Amino acid sequence: MRSFKFNLGQPVAITASGEVGVVVGRAEYINSSNSYFVRYAAKDGRATEAWWSEDALEAAN
């Protein structure tokens, strides 16, 4: 079992877009990477929530 890279409530950035949000949920799987449910403001201003794989996120400054 892998440990989680990000904590609940931790600010994270979506690597591909630079959008920043907060981890509001986490999921672990046997055969794939950990996933995180992130609440963030999309670049067009919409409030958004989506699942992201661990490798698609980085810690926000």
What are the residue ranges of the model-derived segments?
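Basic/aromatic-rich interaction segments and small domains that mediate binding to polyanionic partners
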Residues: 2-7, 11-61
